[in-house]
């Protein structure tokens, strides 16, 4: 069995994650999952432009989410089909962190596991290849928890002076797993 990107970064802390979170991050190959999601719109015109640049939802929605994963030992591609928007990102390892490529942005996350919760802490960001200064770096809440066969997620990103750029929360039902 190949160790997932998240297992590699977390090491022994991986065992502290809720079983549903562990199961989700051990999925390999091409799989699809279904669940429910709610998205919030960006706070300002500038925040909407930035949301467009990083391909995150720009309209408030509530409804089904269809999630497609293509995971190998070196890279994971996540495609989130929201009710009115599709968002794709690619995750790889970078110096002991997870690097997520999302449109014109590269996000560098440290991972933390505590009491079943996975927290992704943004440590660095590059926009169009240019490093973002710490004072301008977004405040990001990115958490996953598990409840039975559901992976719950909560993502919220705000940029100083622009306000909320992206926000969505919901769950994926692990019993809906389909091999693609």
What are the residue ranges of the model-derived segments?
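Soluble ligand-binding/transfer domains with enclosed cavities or grooves
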Residues: 2-147, 151-157, 168
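C-terminal structured interaction module
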Residues: 153-180
